[in-house]
């Protein structure tokens, strides 16, 4: 009997101190991601958000273990932010009000011939390392630069990081860290006669004066093509035949904020309200679930080393084909 009570002690002790466990997790999370706060009040409010997010992650993963979801979540560097804050500070898609489709820029796929069942341009050397846009609405610049990098590799055989900051500072028809649009960026590169390399024009994550240097020009563009809205078959053809494609999605959900692995599909993801620009770098199938390989610009500590597998052929999930385009080089 005494032995039984003794064995229970550690269990009871642990059960009575969940706050200590949370304290330890919070301190470790802050240290891991270099978090510092201006005041104790600020830290308390941020911790409450973090705890709420942690609970959502735990509940989701329990449901996933029971087969309710095809993807898992994990805590990351965005843990002390609400999903509303993430959209406000870390997206940045801003479509021009006067934008309209033109037959001159519409992509018409060549439907003859098969395309691969899967393709991953990371393995083909078309994709530069994942970047972090920080709290600047420059997703459009990273998406555009990534698509240009893919075409540069295809044309020259060389992979070179191009400058999102060049686009942030110099595309006058966009709004820098206040947001922008990918085809506007492609038009700028075409009319400007080029875009600088990342090394020549490094990213600083804020609006600066345009410092484009023609002698540091690393790539040109001779126009762009837009994928027909809602047509995932056309997007697949474009990815297979052309290369990485700039797209927009709804990134407003907590499930996207903390995506970790698996094929992301959330029925609440709003295909009619896209707000974030990313890059499709391939497609495939996992355990019977078709997906797009998406390169994000929230750093390697987000998602699966900076990437998400987004559900493919699931009724335009998250609006992935609403604003898809690629540059011509």
UniProtKB/Swiss-Prot annotation:
It is a peripheral membrane protein. Belongs to the peptidase C1 family. The lineage of its organism: Eukaryota, Metazoa, Chordata, Craniata, Vertebrata. Glycans are attached at residues 103, 213. It is found in: Lysosome; Secreted; Apical cell membrane. SMART domains: Inhibitor_I29, Pept_C1. The keyword Transferase does not apply. PROSITE patterns: THIOL_PROTEASE_ASN, THIOL_PROTEASE_CYS, THIOL_PROTEASE_HIS. Disulfide bonds join 136-177, 170-210, 269-318. GO terms for cellular component: apical plasma membrane; external side of plasma membrane; extracellular space; lysosome. Its EC number is 3.4.22.38. This is Cathepsin K. Thiol protease involved in osteoclastic bone resorption and may participate partially in the disorder of bone remodeling. Displays potent endoprotease activity against fibrinogen at acid pH. May play an important role in extracellular matrix degradation. Involved in the release of thyroid hormone thyroxine (T4) by limited proteolysis of TG/thyroglobulin in the thyroid follicle lumen. InterPro entries: Papain-like_cys_pep_sf, Pept_asp_AS, Pept_cys_AS, Pept_his_AS, Peptidase_C1A, Peptidase_C1A_C, Peptidase_C1A_papain-like, Prot_inhib_I29. Its main location: other. Residues 1-15 form the signal peptide. GO terms for molecular function: collagen binding; cysteine-type endopeptidase activity; cysteine-type peptidase activity; fibronectin binding; proteoglycan binding.
């Amino acid at each position: 009997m005494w032995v039984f009570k003794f064995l229970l002690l550690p269990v009871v002790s642990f059960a009575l101190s969940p706050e200590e466990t949370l304290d330890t997790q919070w301190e470790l999370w802050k240290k891991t991601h270099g978090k510092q706060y201006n005041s104790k009040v600020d830290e308390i409010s941020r911790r409450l958000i973090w705890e709420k997010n942690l609970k959502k992650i735990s509940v989701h993963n329990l449901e996933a273990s029971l087969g309710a979801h095809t993807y898992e979540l994990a805590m990351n560097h965005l843990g002390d932010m609400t999903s509303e804050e993430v959209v406000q500070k870390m997206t940045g898609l801003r479509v021009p009000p006067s934008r309209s489709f033109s037959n001159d820029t519409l992509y018409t796929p060549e439907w003859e011939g098969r395309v691969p069942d899967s393709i991953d341009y990371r393995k083909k050397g078309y994709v530069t390392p994942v970047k972090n846009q920080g709290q600047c609405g420059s997703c459009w610049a990273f998406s555009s630069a990534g698509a240009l990098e893919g075409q540069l590799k295809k044309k020259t055989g060389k992979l070179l990081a191009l400058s999102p900051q060049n686009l942030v500072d110099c595309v006058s028809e966009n709004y820098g860290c206040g947001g922008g649009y990918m085809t506007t960026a492609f038009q700028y590169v075409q009319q400007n006669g080029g875009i600088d390399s990342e090394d020549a024009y490094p990213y600083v994550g804020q609006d600066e004066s345009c410092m484009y240097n023609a002698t540091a020009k690393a790539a040109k563009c001779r126009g762009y093509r837009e994928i027909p809205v809602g047509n995932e078959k056309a997007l697949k053809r474009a990815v297979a035949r052309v290369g990485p494609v700039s797209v927009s999605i709804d990134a407003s959900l907590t499930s996207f904020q903390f995506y970790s692995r698996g094929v992301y599909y959330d029925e609440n993801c709003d295909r009619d309200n896209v707000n974030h620009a990313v890059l499709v770098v391939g497609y495939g199938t996992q355990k019977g679930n078709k997906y797009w390989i998406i390169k994000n610009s929230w750093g390697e500590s987000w998602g699966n080393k900076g990437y998400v597998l987004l559900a493919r052929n699931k009724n335009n999930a998250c609006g992935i084909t609403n604003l898809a385009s690629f540059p011509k080089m």
